[in-house]
Structures are given as C-alpha cells and as structure tokens.
Curated annotation (Swiss-Prot):
Family that this chain belongs to: Belongs to the glyoxalase I family.
PANTHER family: GLYOXALASE/BLEOMYCIN RESISTANCE PROTEIN/DIOXYGENASE, GLYOXALASE_BLEOMYCIN RESISTANCE PROTEIN_DIOXYGENASE
Species assigned in the record: Bacillus subtilis (strain 168)
GO MF annotation terms: lyase activity; methylmalonyl-CoA epimerase activity
Gene name of this polypeptide: yurT
Keywords: Lyase
Protein name per UniProt: Uncharacterized protein YurT
Stretches assigned to the VOC domain: 1-127
Keyword field contains Hydrolase: no
C-alpha cells in the first residue's frame, strides 16, 4: 500500500492553484470540474508520477473549523521535504512568500514554516 493522493484544505481553489504553482513550483496534474468545485491535484516537478496533493475546498463547516484552529495554534497543515532549506527559503522569500518561522535547526532536521495565503501554515524540512 502507498499514499497516492493527500489533501490540504484551501479557502479558494483558484488562489491556491496560483500560489502552489507560481510561488512553490508544483505542477498541475488534474483539474476536473465537479459541480461548484474542481478536483485539482498537483505534483512535484521532481516526481511527476509521485504523490498528488489535492487542493480540497474547505466548504464543510468541520473543515473550516479544523483549518482555522490549527492555523491559529501555529500548527503546519502539512510538510514538504527540501534538499537545501536555506536555498529554498531564499527562493521563496524572493517570490514574496511570508515565513512565520525562519530556518531553524531541530535535532537532526532543519525546518521553516510559511503561510500559503489559503488558510494554512506549511512546514518545509531538510533532513
């Protein structure tokens, strides 16, 4: 068994698609109309056959509450791995991404956290 799709709640699918592709550099894999919303998945440019990230609308009240609560508590919604965190931090800062935590060594890993502008904090990690 393997993970093929994982999701992240977003406030606005179009805004999320723009942020995740133009700022972070992910590639749109699927964009299928499904009534009021769309099934939008993204993949890493380095692993286009790998795990897909679904931009899930947060329309359900439980999803909205969950997203608001973890954001207000400063908890990242998900984590992305990077080879060189300082290089990635600098690249994202140049693109206007707002970080809530600068690169910080924590034991064997270094982490940084940014705001995805769609209601989430995202952690990047270098192992």
């Amino acid at each position: 068994m393997k993970i093929v799709v994982t999701s992240i709640f977003v406030q606005d699918q179009d805004m999320a698609l723009e942020f995740y592709t133009e700022k972070l550099g992910f590639i749109k894999k699927e964009d299928v109309p499904m009534g009021k919303f769309r099934w939008i998945t993204l993949v890493s440019p380095d692993d286009q056959d790998g795990t897909e990230l679904l931009l899930e609308p947060n329309e359900h009240p439980a999803a909205k509450e969950y997203q608001k609560k973890i954001f207000s508590e400063g908890l990242p919604a998900t984590m992305f791995g990077v080879a060189d965190i300082q290089k990635e931090y600098n690249r994202l800062k140049e693109k206007g991404v707002t970080f809530t935590t600068e690169p910080t060594k924590m034991g064997e890993v270094t982490i940084a956290v940014f705001d995805d502008t769609c209601g989430n904090l995202i952690q990047i990690v270098q192992k």
